[in-house]
Amino acid sequence: MAGPLRAPLLLLAILAVALAVSPAAGASPGKPPRLVGGPMDASVEEEGVRRALDFAVSEYNKASNDMYHSRALQVVRARKQIVAGVNYFLDVELGRTTCTKTQPNLDNCPFHEQPHLKRKAFCSFQIYTVPWQGTMTLSKSTCQDA
């Protein structure tokens, strides 16, 4: 009698294992499954995200011909991807400050309020970092006036 039950039990066991290892196994209802090694949402409060943001804004200011510094008004979206290091993908709204590029401290610079000097940009940055080597690179940067 054990023979006839063996095949269905074997099929049931194979099905259970296949479901357990499938990418959809850990998915929440209504959300697509997260891929291992794929980009995932990150908090702006994470130290790595903050460092990547500071680096990207610094590089933006270096490349800009504007006499004023810009700084982040709002981080619209932050994602990270673990590779042979970490890729950060940041969508950021930047605002022009009253501080000129000759002023070293950007943290306390207020944003311009005068209409003819006020300027905003929306930027998408990709930053690659290898924290244990202390390296950070701006891989991609696209900005448009907001």
From Swiss-Prot:
One of its GO terms (cellular component) is plasma membrane. Residues 1-26 form the signal peptide. It is found in: Secreted. It holds the Pfam family Cystatin. GO terms for molecular function: amyloid-beta binding; cysteine-type endopeptidase inhibitor activity; identical protein binding; protease binding. The modification Phosphoserine is found at S43. Keywords: Amyloid, Disulfide bond, Phosphoprotein, Protease inhibitor, Secreted, Signal, Thiol protease inhibitor. InterPro entries: Cystatin_dom, Cystatin_sf, Prot_inh_cystat_CS. Disulfide bonds join C99-C109, C123-C143. Gene3D superfamilies: 3.10.450.10. A motif (Secondary area of contact) lies at residues 81-85. GO terms for biological process: defense response; negative regulation of blood vessel remodeling; negative regulation of collagen catabolic process; negative regulation of elastin catabolic process; negative regulation of extracellular matrix disassembly; negative regulation of proteolysis; supramolecular fiber organization. The record marks G37 as: Reactive site. As an inhibitor of cysteine proteinases, this protein is thought to serve an important physiological role as a local regulator of this enzyme activity. Belongs to the cystatin family. This is Cystatin-C. It comes from Macaca mulatta (Rhesus macaque). The gene is CST3.
